[in-house]
Amino acid sequence: MASGKAGGASALFSEATQAEQLDSHTYRVNLNQGFCIGAVPNGGYTSACMLAAASKHLGPRGQPDTLTAHFEYPNRTSTGPAIVVIEDVKLGRQISTLHLTLWQGGLLSQAPWIDRSVSRRIVLAYTTHTNLRTFSGISMPTGYEVTPAAELPSVSDFEALKTHGADDAWAESKLPKGWAAMMLSLTQWRFYVPRKEPLSPGVLDMWIRLASGEKITQGALAYVVDSFPHNMHTFLAAPALRELLNASPERSGDSEVKDVRKKDQQRAEMWFPTVVMNIEAKTALPEEGVEWLSVRVSSKQIKEGKFDLEVLVRDTDGEMVALSNHVAMILSVERNTGKKSGSSKASL
């Protein structure tokens, strides 16, 4: 596995999510700096590390795939070692349910691995696991499948996107100059968004791939559904607000335009931590993974410093891969980078 240190920004996702078994129900992971927003590892990446431990735990039972997962993030994660403790809630023939707890601070080099007087519960999860490749049962088409919302966005000229960063319909969303150091997690991805207006009002459609060239596997889905371009808010915004953001130079002196653009410039000073995240896997990706996925993101309400997200993930054939729902907050970036109380010393 990765070393006990925080690790650099160049690690591959598959390397940065390795889980080492310490005993029958305890695993060690290493949260890598390259997957951080500010000082905090991305919540989806951290969740993927936990699910890697769960997959290893249930692999001998032939249930390596996550079917559903509910994550809560009561405390802020840090880079470096963490302990994942697994409780078998119910071990079934087709589906098993686990309770996962990720601990940091005061970690020990031998059993019991954590010091409960110092260590902190950082992330909690209830998860269900199965084998998606052998799962079978009744299927039927739904009315949703014939609605406009179910239509797959136009398939990109993927080679043009990789070579030139754009095609006729899509263009890469690039971080503004100076943002990369703060948003290392976003540099792990290439996000391609509509070149013009959102395909649907208040909806972000995008094609994504890993910047490293790695294929996206089943184990990456928790990270997929929690990774968004820096300008996502401009797509989720109401059409009238988006019009102000994109107003012509002739309107640059308008008070409304100036006010909206001033607030938009404050985006770099904001942090959007996830409070709760739910995931449901709809189908199994190929074992070797895929290069491209289509992701659709929408929000019902952004109000008083909190917001919801609904995420739909599909493959290039339009097959539904995963669904996810989030509750998140909008906080000052100082809440991300400020010092935490309590000891975080680890001996692992």
Swiss-Prot record:
It is an enzyme of class 3 (hydrolase). The keyword Nucleus does not apply. Pfam families: 4HBT_3, 4HBT_3C. Pathway: Secondary metabolite biosynthesis. Keywords: Hydrolase. The keyword Hydrolase applies. Its EC number is 3.1.2.-. Signal peptide: none annotated. GO terms for molecular function: hydrolase activity. InterPro entries: ACOT8-like_C (IPR049450), Acyl-CoA_hotdog (IPR042171), HotDog_dom_sf (IPR029069), Sec_Metab_Biosynth-Assoc (IPR052389), TesB_ACOT8-like_N (IPR049449). Thioesterase-like protein; part of the gene cluster that mediates the biosynthesis of wortmanamides A and B, reduced long-chain polyketides amidated with a specific omega-amino acid, 5-aminopentanoic acid (5PA). The PKS modules of TwmB are involved in the synthesis of the polyketide backbone, whereas the non-canonical C domain of TwmB is a bonafide condensation domain that specifically selects 5PA and catalyzes amidation to release polyketide chain. This is Thioesterase-like protein TwmA. It comes from Talaromyces wortmannii. The gene is TwmA.
